[in-house]
Amino acid sequence: MLKNINPTQTQAWKALTAHFESAQDMDLKELFAQDAARFDKYSARFGSDILVDYSKNLINEETLKHLFALANETELKSAIEAMFSGEAINKTEDRAVLHTALRNRSNTPVMVGGEDVMPAVNAVLEKIKSFTERVIGGEWKGYTGKAITDIVNIGIGGSDLGPYMVTEALAPYKNHLNLHFVSNVDGTHIVETLKKVDPETTLFLIASKTFTTQETMTNAHSARDWFLATAGDQAHVAKHFAALSTNAPAVSEFGIDTDNMFEFWDWVGGRYSLWSAIGLSIALAVGYDNFIELLDGAHEMDNHFVSTDLESNIPVILALIGIWYNNFHGAESEAILPYDQYMHRFAAYFQQGNMESNGKYVDREGNAVTYQTGPIIWGEPGTNGQHAFYQLIHQGTKLIPCDFIAPAISHNPASDHHQKLMSNFFAQTEALAFGKSAETVKAEFAKAGKSEEEMASLVPFKVFEGNRPTNSILVKQITPRTLGNLIAMYEHKIFVQGVIWNIFSFDQWGVELGKQLANQILPELADESEINSHDSSTNGLINAFKAFKA
């Protein structure tokens, strides 16, 4: 079980507080000038394909010493062991947390309730293999005998964000099948998607563990109605719909053959479910072998996380540096900035992964915390972000630690595009770290022939303070394996921070209240009668909505 340890009561936290007071004038220019080996000391390699450079952070040896002490005092190692051994560390739902078992390529037994889950995991993988080979190979036929050309994944949250992110990131590996993702209950999403597909050659994947999720089932019923408007016979549904679920009666009632139901388990959290049957759309998009490569990559990072000392453990290092900014520097957000267009949904994926996991104000004993927990996560691909929000990162008043991610080898080496992209990648972290002094600005102005008066009026606006922290994550190439490495790295970073903050990272009760209230409001929207059962604002909005519709 996870221990209940208030991090602020540890000796390490107190030492970090004192260290922060004395280290507020820490300057990256000076840190690099004082230590020619700083990059070597504060960077780590994962295998031969990933380099993590954390040298451009506001840290020194003393900072890291206290951060590792914090990890030890909060018993991080025992927490890691508890998760991987199948203990029910998701206490509020009384569940184990074993997305790692889904990618346990060593097949060593993983016990839940006295039972090894690996045979069941492998059975689902075999079922995915058989199914995807039939669909990709054209053996699976629609109701008119035509092969499938389009896959529509209908899900929401983890049943959508993960598969969508991965299929986009691995687009260079895609086969002939066209992938579409529908998540929003806004009818526009399903209607616009259905305009692009043919009922004779489309396969729908309905991704809902309970087969009751409102948004997913609303879209699923609309898709079935659209399909039957052409196909006519309810029996044809079985050839065009598959389910990623555990509710066999509901799946069967919908018209899906339960042979085409792919199960997963309650120890798989939604935001960690792409490794499970929820990843069926990934396997269909890039092929089963590439899906297994993705699992292999994640398993490699799992092994590193479990077996590596904290001081050399990449997810642990990244997590601790994040805590340094979040809890001591007062940083409220972190930016994830992939310099790879295929990775354009990576930040959005970990926005859910991080904010749904660690957006908690109650500790593991049920008490309100007195310290900051999960940060706001956001980001966009480079170089788009440079022309949008980097201004604030460079010259704004908020400290925003950034992760820059880039591949050394592009899948599209067109002309000199990649060199230009990478020159920006390297330049941005250098600019953020070291800035540009007033003296340098003046010298540039003087060289350009500016007058003293012009210089005096413009210099303050051209100065870059620097000292903006970044991590640089350089990947040889984005492949299924390295993508698996990266996803698992961030997953474990989130876990480490949750352990240290003494919160439960694997529930998400914060999503429930809005859903409950929506279910109460829904019948109130069925007619034109005036509503007065809520507060004045909600009543006014509902009644205005009805008036607009009238």
Swiss-Prot record:
Job of this protein: Catalyzes the reversible isomerization of glucose-6-phosphate to fructose-6-phosphate.
Originating gene: pgi
Alphabetic keyword roster: Cytoplasm, Gluconeogenesis, Glycolysis, Isomerase
Transmembrane segments: none
One Pfam assignment: PGI
Source organism: Vibrio campbellii (strain ATCC BAA-1116)
Main location: cytoplasm
Keyword Isomerase: yes
GO biological process, one term: glycolytic process
Enzymatic reactions: alpha-D-glucose 6-phosphate = beta-D-fructose 6-phosphate
Location relative to the cell: Cytoplasm
SUPFAM superfamilies, sorted: SIS domain (SSF53697)
The EC number(s) this enzyme carries: 5.3.1.9
Lineage of the organism: Bacteria, Pseudomonadati, Pseudomonadota, Gammaproteobacteria, Vibrionales
Protein's recorded name: Glucose-6-phosphate isomerase
Listed pathway(s): Carbohydrate biosynthesis; gluconeogenesis; Carbohydrate degradation; glycolysis; D-glyceraldehyde 3-phosphate and glycerone phosphate from D-glucose: step 2/4
